Amino acid sequence: MFTNQARILVCVLLLLVSALAGYYEVYEITALGIMLAGSVVWGYFKEGPIILAAKQYKLKNYQKAKDLLLTIKKPEYLNKRRKPYYEFLLGNISVNQMDYTNAEYHLGKAAVMGLRANDLGVALMHLANISLRNKDKDKGMVWIIQAEKIPLTEKYKSILKNIEKELRQIK
């Protein structure tokens, strides 16, 4: 749950403590400091700043959330539970910035990777809405059929029914 700058600072401090402990021949502290620095580096590759980005997204600070997500240089190294949320957040940010081609790409990847049911419903709803904007009836209906297979709240069901009604009017 660190930014990259905070991770670097923590690693440097831990390595300095380890070096100091090694100088005073307290090898247990040296080993502990190195292991903790290793866990911070491991967290960078496996977790990334996704939790911080999600917090910024909920605060409606979309640019900050996007900047945090884009600091992840190799998203393919993320934990398999974090990858879908990386794509989901990027897709939702793209929807809010009205960049529908990127939104469709990221939300499509997130839907395939395995989101929780509620988040999957939101992703499929956005994908159906993007298909409606693009006047792509077939693709929109596929997303709606997929969304109907999962348990959704009444709010999402009513939104999907409205999207489906509008999709059926497309010739």
Per-segment meaning from a language model:
Residues L78-K83, L115-L120, K149-N162:
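Boundary/linker segments of alpha-helical solenoid repeat arrays
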